[in-house]
């Protein structure tokens, strides 16, 4: 077949280069919008269900987030929000937070957006810390420590900074970190025969956990919500156990320093009841019993509250 002459029509069934290019251009998918960490949104006429969903937002997902409730010039109530995510996300992923909201990539600094979203004073949510201008990673790590974040989180979010300045960040935490305890730590005792599931019950309890090993040191303690003292038979000094199970400020030793004890819950598992842990000739076991808030015992196939006949002294008073 002879080639087409310039200006002539292509053979039947063939498409000219120009026409093919036009078709490809028409059917080409629009480019995907680039992912970003910083977004702002507006949600008009928010429902109670949508407002309540803010309670499910996790601080671990954000460097900073703020949501304010406002009324527009036309009288339309709306939510005005800004998020600075830890991981870049595209618009479809953000729709999982608020499907009906109008989302745009944010302009200005975190502080600018903080002021804008809180201008009417009705702030429904704040998470994290707003980054200031062109703040360095070290400055952000320091701000995280000052805000009371756990050192494990600081190390995870600022790994390179932690490798370089970990000792300084830890020293800063010790100097200005956690506030002393001003609440009663809840004490849960679980007793029963070997293999009944005491350790599993403790491991399944919600919250971050620190397992206290036998010995003086609390190395690795970083203000976890729950402290587990597993398979206990009295190997902590009696006076130390009384202090950590109380409501007053107390510091525990780590190598080279002391840190505030601020855990909300202590779970003690043992094969023996609390009155068998220490000699009553030397220790006032009644003082320990009064600090116990809940005592569970194994009863054939489940854990139940210990009956009064097992309690040598009253608990939780």
Swiss-Prot record:
It comes from the Viruses. A divalent metal cation binds at residues 70, 78, 120. One of its GO terms (biological process) is DNA replication. This is Replication-associated protein. Its cofactor is Mg(2+); Mn(2+). ATP binds at residues 192-199. A motif (Nuclear localization signal) lies at residues 5-40, 87-107. Gene3D superfamilies: 3.40.1310.20. It comes from Pigeon circovirus. InterPro entries: CRESS_DNA_REP, Helicase_SF3_ssDNA/RNA_vir, P-loop_NTPase. Essential for the replication of viral ssDNA. The closed circular ssDNA genome is first converted to a superhelical dsDNA. Rep and/or Rep' binds a specific hairpin at the genome origin of replication. Introduces an endonucleolytic nick within the conserved sequence 5'-AGTATTAC-3' in the intergenic region of the genome, thereby initiating the rolling circle replication (RCR). Following cleavage, binds covalently to the 5'-phosphate of DNA as a tyrosyl ester. The cleavage gives rise to a free 3'-OH that serves as a primer for the cellular DNA polymerase. It is found in: Host nucleus. A motif (RCR-3) lies at residues 116-119. A motif (RCR-1) lies at residues 40-43. One of its GO terms (molecular function) is nucleotidyltransferase activity. Residues 1-34 are annotated as: Disordered. Divalent metal cations, possibly Mg(2+) or Mn(2+). Belongs to the nanoviruses/circoviruses replication-associated protein family. The keyword ATP-binding applies. There are 3 rolling circle replication (RCR) motifs. RCR-2 is probably involved in metal coordination. RCR-3 is required for phosphodiester bond cleavage for initiation of RCR. The lineage of its organism: Viruses, Monodnaviria, Shotokuvirae, Cressdnaviricota, Arfiviricetes. Its EC number is 2.7.7.-, 3.1.21.-, 3.6.1.-.
